[in-house]
A protein has these predicted regions:
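Conserved catalytic core of the tyrosine transesterase superfamily
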Residues: 1-247
C-alpha cells in the first residue's frame, strides 16, 4: 500500500505542499472509510518523513464509534432458525446455533468444546496471559445435549464433528450457517457465528443488568468493550423512534 499510495499522489497531485496534501486528504475522506483513509495518510506521512518534509504531515481522521449495533441476529430469527433445523432433523446444527446463542462462545472456542465439558457444565479457557475464563453451559442446553448424545451413542470427544468424524472447523461452521440462511430465507449478513455472541450479550444485559459479570463471561479485557451491548440495533432504534416521536 505504501508504494501504491505515494505513486498515486505523485501522479495526481505532483508537488508535496499544504494545498495539495489537504486536497488529497479531502479526496480520501469522500471516497473511503476512515480506517482506509488513515492507512493512506500513514503511508504519505512516512514518505514525507523520508524526503525531509515532516512539517507537512497530515493528521489522522477521527474514527467515530457507531451509536448502534450492526448485523446482530434478532431473537425471532434465532428462534426460527433453531426451529427449522430441528424440524428438518439437522440436530447437530440445531445445537451449534443454540450453543452460539446461549454460551457467548467465539466460534474458535465452540469447536473446542468436548462431550466431557457438557457433562461438567462448563469449559475452562485460558488466554495467552494465563487468565482463566469459564464458559458456562446452561442447564436446559446441557440436558438437551445429553439426550441427543445418548441417541447418537457418543460419550467422549469433540462435541461438533464434520462428515468425516473429525472436529469441525470454524470456517466450516461459518459456511454452513450461510447455507442455512439462504435455505430458510434469512439475511446471511446476520447469520454468522459472532452475531450470536452479540445476541447472547444483548439478551444477558436485558435480563441481568450486570455489565461487569458480562465482561468476565465474554472474556473482555476492558469493561468499555462490553458497553457497546448497552446500545440498541439500528432496527430497534428506528422502532423506538416510531413509537416515541409522534409530534
Amino acid at each position: 500500500m505504501y508504494l501504491w499510495t505515494v505513486d498515486y499522489y505523485v501522479t495526481n497531485y505532483k508537488d508535496f505542499n499544504v494545498e495539495n496534501l489537504h486536497a488529497y486528504k479531502g479526496y480520501l475522506m469522500e471516497f473511503f472509510k476512515p480506517k482506509t483513509v488513515n492507512l493512506r495518510i500513514q503511508a504519505i506521512n512516512k514518505y514525507l518523513d523520508y524526503i525531509g518534509k515532516n512539517k507537512l504531515r497530515l493528521s489522522a481522521v477521527k474514527i467515530q464509534q457507531k451509536t448502534f449495533l450492526e448485523n446482530v441476529v434478532s431473537n425471532a430469527d434465532y428462534t426460527f432458525l433453531k426451529k427449522q433445523l430441528k424440524k428438518d432433523g439437522n440436530m447437530q446444527w440445531y445445537f451449534v446455533v443454540w450453543y452460539l446463542g446461549a454460551t457467548g462462545a467465539r466460534v474458535s472456542e465452540l469447536i473446542r468444546i468436548k462431550i466431557e465439558h457438557v457433562n461438567l457444565g462448563y469449559f475452562d479457557l485460558y488466554s495467552k496471559g494465563g487468565k482463566l475464563r469459564r464458559l458456562y453451559i446452561p442447564k436446559k442446553l446441557r440436558e438437551e445435549t445429553q439426550k441427543w448424545l445418548s441417541e447418537e451413542q457418543r460419550t467422549t470427544g469433540y462435541l461438533f464433528l464434520n462428515r468425516f468424524g473429525e472436529r469441525i472447523t470454524a470456517r466450516g461452521i461459518s459456511q454452513q450457517l450461510k447455507n442455512y440462511a439462504d435455505k430458510y430465507g434469512l439475511d446471511s449478513k446476520v447469520i454468522y457465528p459472532h452475531s450470536f455472541r452479540h445476541l447472547y450479550a444483548k439478551n444477558f444485559l436485558e435480563k441481568c443488568n450486570d455489565i461487569a459479570l458480562l465482561a468476565d463471561l465474554m472474556g473482555h479485557e476492558s469493561i468499555e468493550t462490553t458497553r457497546i451491548y448497552l446500545r440498541r440495533t439500528a432496527t430497534e432504534q428506528q422502532s423506538l423512534i416510531d413509537k416515541i416521536v409522534t409530534w
